[in-house]
């Protein structure tokens, strides 16, 4: 865990997210919290991670998602050398 982000404010945000009970509640909360572009960027990174996990090439990912190679590379680095957060979520989602 990155100690730079471990703050009371971040803990409070994560507690708020964990309190959400449905996809509709997530839409309501995240539409209030994030700009459209911020939310689309987060979802793009998640899609990139899923495609990398499935063995897709950078070219295939860039064509489907519109992500830059820099974004794809950053996500790939997180998948390979990060805190296993993507893996945890993918396992729970059955991906």
Question: Model-found features: residue ranges?
Answer:
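General marker for long, soluble alpha-helical cores
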Residues: 59, 87, 92-95
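Short, Lys/Arg-enriched anionic-surface-contact patches
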Residues: 25-44, 94
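General nucleic-acid-binding
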Residues: 1-20
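Short, solvent-exposed alpha-helical "recognition" segments
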Residues: 77-90
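Short, amphipathic alpha-helical "recognition" segments used to contact nucleic acids or chromatin
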Residues: 42-56
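Short alpha-helical "recognition helix" segments of helix-turn-helix
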Residues: 60-65, 72
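Residues at alpha-helix boundaries and the short loops/turns that link adjacent helices
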Residues: 20-24, 36, 55
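Major-groove recognition helix of helix-turn-helix-like DNA-binding domains
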Residues: 48, 72-79
